[in-house]
Amino acid sequence: SAIFGGDVRVPGQVYAALVQAPTFGATVASVDDNVARSRRGVKDVVVLSATATSAAAVAVVAERTWQALAAVADLRVEWTPGPGATHDTDAQRARYESLARTGEARVFDAAGTPDLGLAAPPILLDSLYHVPYLAHAAMEPLNATALVRDGSCEIWVGNQAPTLVRWFAAKTADVPADRVTVHTPYLGGGFGRRVEMDVVVQAVTLAKRMPGVPVQLVWSREEDMRHDVYRPMATARCRAALDSRGNVMAWVTRVVSQSCTGSLVGRLLPAAASDAMKDRTALEGLFDLPYDLPHRRAEHVLTREPVPVGYWRSVGYSHNAFFAESFVDECAHAAKRDPFEFRRTLLRHAPRHRAVLEAAAARADWGAPLASGQGRGIALAESYRTIVAQVAEVEVRGAEVRVLRVVCAVDCGFALDPDIVRAQIEGGIVFGLTAALLGEITVKKGAVI
């Protein structure tokens, strides 16, 4: 049967759990661990300093996982607030909305003379969109098992970057990289989260204190949600000019967000980090639109926040496709055109995209009557050379939104295993609906609540 990271068992293994800084950047001031140490099975209580990859924490090592988790609850930790102690996502959103209009931006894609088209068109649209921070929330919480002995290190961890695991394990254990053995079991969901090295550094640090003893560190679900590297919060300002017949004369998008790539590089490869680096992931899905928009510009306003961000399933496309397709709908409405037909017109030079759009609309019976309170929407995106169109049928009752059906058409080229493609698409639909309706991460007074 499949072995995941949490299934790993090594002879003589002990177990660890931890509590991490409650606010971004906080450090440990003091620890009262008397009650925790008195619990049966507890072997050690360890203060873990903050690193470039991980928050400050206090860990308990015990004979069993439950003993470690229970002892963590008995810890009395005093924390010294850090620079992120006052951070608030409501205030951040207000600041982003201002920056979307006035911030200094870097241009990623430009063609034609969009500003001329925006000067005095028959129809002008100017819209703001916003998405929150999102956690990865993989089904299997973070875990790693490490063994340090005789100048070597062995580690078992579900991961998306074994070379980085080797580097960071070697540095933490203070052994040569060629003395590190990395085992990569199945991982219970990655989505970009398991390219990070926080749990690796923490597990190896604990194992180094207990030479010859394998230590399995398991994060609780609460720690997993409060100490993710999140999909960035982002605000977009989208402007378009339409002529009197509803044709797009100009299209300008500006996104305000942190840099996923810059944040990740700063944690994992700090020597390569540079403020001059342009992060294409911040605007992917906007600078590479398939639509016929000869007068366009896509630009990014870079921000820096105490909230760590990283790669999240589909990265920039996860929010930029939403921005672009929502605005296409607004343009269609302003032009008094059907959203499907409006897109077909914009795809006159993109036959593959147009075929996918038409397939989704046909399979969904686009234009068929709907019951009162129900609606139907369509969207198209290309991400990593795969073209996807979806039609969603929804029902609104008061404040409740119910998704009744999603029809999806995909052109990914040659499908070597169609069942895997189907599984990925079905999972992506559920993932996207969860993100849109339920996934918001809120920060108050520097803490995820």
What are these language model-derived features?
Residues 421, 443-449:
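Hydrophobic alpha-helical bundle architecture
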Residues 1-416, 437-445:
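Structural alpha/beta core scaffold segments of enzyme domains
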Residues 415-430:
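Conserved phosphate-binding loops in nucleotide/dinucleotide-binding enzymes
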